């Protein structure tokens, strides 16, 4: 198990500066966001010229633990073509895993199983693992729903973002049943009122999460994912460093 850093920690920087900041903090791997509405790389950039994007990412002198992907496409076919290009980029850069969002809350389960089965095959053809993230606004908002998707879609994994099971008026959801499906993890500190708080001010049980992952023989990334869009008042580096050191002391 190793600690990686999300490029979303530094989304206010140009991408080259963000990757440099992550490298300066002595992370060896980056959880790279490719969001169509984001300020860094977009999936459409990859479709337009994959070789140019690959060259640019190689120049940064960091390795990539995962791609965190949000595609905006007019139809299912265009979505598949875009995902295929991103997965191909993953193969070229030896990125093991590509994450996408599951369908929004309230979507039809069998339709989503069909969609994700097709997308998982695309990823597998390029030699990468496809995951969906646990998120309060998607079908994975409910632990049972997330587990059901993974059971019904062969080869699909989960990116565990435990914050989304902690926020809200009800008690924190027990997400232990999901650990067998987890292929990637994103962490920040969280309370029931706020998705992101300063490290040490929240209730995320990092030690328990790590011991559950070890039980499943997990050997992948724990990604520091503190968004600079949440807490604009302070510099990001001290917070990111604090969580990095905390996680490294546990693995």
Please annotate each region the language model reported.
Residues 1-7, 12-28, 51-54, 58-61, ...:
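Histidine-acidic metal/acid-base catalytic patches
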Residues 7-9, 33-34, 68, 102:
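Residue-level recognition of beta-strand->loop/alpha-helix junctions
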Residues 8, 42-43, 76, 109, ...:
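A generic secondary-structure micro-motif detector
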Residues 16-17, 56-63, 69-160, 166-167:
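Active-site acidic/histidine proton-transfer and metal-coordination neighborhood
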Residues 31-54, 105-106:
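Glycine-rich, proline-tolerant flexible connector loops at the mouths of alpha/beta enzymes
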Residues 35, 72, 103, 190, ...:
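Flexible loop residues that form catalytic
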Residues 35-38, 137, 165, 193:
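Active-site loop signature of alpha/beta-hydrolase-fold enzymes
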Residues 41-47, 76-80, 110, 233-234:
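Metal-dependent catalytic neighborhoods of phosphoester/phosphodiester hydrolases
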